[in-house]
Amino acid sequence: MSWATIRADEYCESVRDGTHDTPKQTETGYKLVTGKHIKNGQIDPSEAYCISEKDYKKINERSLVEQWDVLMSMIGTVGEVAVVKDHPNYAIKNVALFKCAGSELKGKWLAYYLQSSDAQGHMSGNQKGSSQQFLSLKQLRSLPVPVADEAYMQKVVDVLSVYDDLIENNQKQIKLLEEAAQRLYKEWFVDLRFPGHETTPIVDGVPEGWKKYKFSEITSIMSGGTPKTEVKEYYEGDIPFYTPKDSDGSFFTFDTITHISEDGLAHCNSQYFPEGTVIITARGTVGKTTILAVPMAMNQSCYALKCDELNSPYYLFFSLNKEVDALKTMANGGVFNTIIVKTFDSINLTVPTQEVLSVFDAVVSSIMEQIKTKMRQKTHLAEARDRLLPKLMSGEIEV
């Protein structure tokens, strides 16, 4: 097999980046995608803010994103990569744009290479900036890209795409299960159509026997901390260390980007929070919630929540999500950029009877366990793909 290495700007039609300006946020319009909306090979514009049509068109005069282009985060968290599989209608800011001339093969090959350990290592070793790491446009254009004959490249892409298709199908099943769990919570505790609701009187706005609290009255609210980053040994362990960068919207978190040692844990203000702890991000990406699937530590930009009156974390998790959505609505287009301990004084937690809670936990636990199983399967598929990827792309394993 004959291989060559060429520059990214030779491989691509062009290599560009998104706007460096900060267009004004609008209530409706077009999404402005940044690096934080690219994660695990997917582009998720749902959390991006909207900009006007005028700003959208202005950005796209030089940075139009089209099908089979490749996007990559280039500032802050560098190297999150995704190929554009659909016909997008968003603009980009501070994101690398590799134009692939509408070629599915070129787009997928490049995306797979940029996700490989070779490419990630190259980019990691060439980042600039002290407080915030970045890759310059000049560096992006000069990235080395290995190429082979088109037939071989297609075979490699086809093999890796099988894994991606399985991962994508798995993610769709997870989403359906998440929606089922959310519907169950809404039906029982928002619409109040819980078992036995027909014969349960409403007293002071809630079903008889239910109790109303402020979150802070009934929930333990615990903060985290960060070991000194200059002490290398603190970050040479296997304890997952949760930060807002790990908040991808998943119901459960199994692992984190950063890990710390037991010595690092002993030298920071974080506890070692047990499995089942509910986490909410307080700064950065604010209001993202998750449930720890394994014990973890966390930094000071999050809160850990625990309620001893509840049988499991699931009712607390869904109730917290509902209240965070309400807080975002109350912001009414304003900036919802931080949660402090006093925030929990202003949000409510209604606790049903133990009988209703026990039945809910029994039903929803079955759904949540299926979600965890599917998430583990997705992780194993991704790990298998990632082990295979460099061997296929280097020619170590031929297809």
Per-region residue spans from a language model:
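Short edge beta-strand segments in beta-sheet-rich domains
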Residues: 28-30, 90-93, 130, 138-140, ...
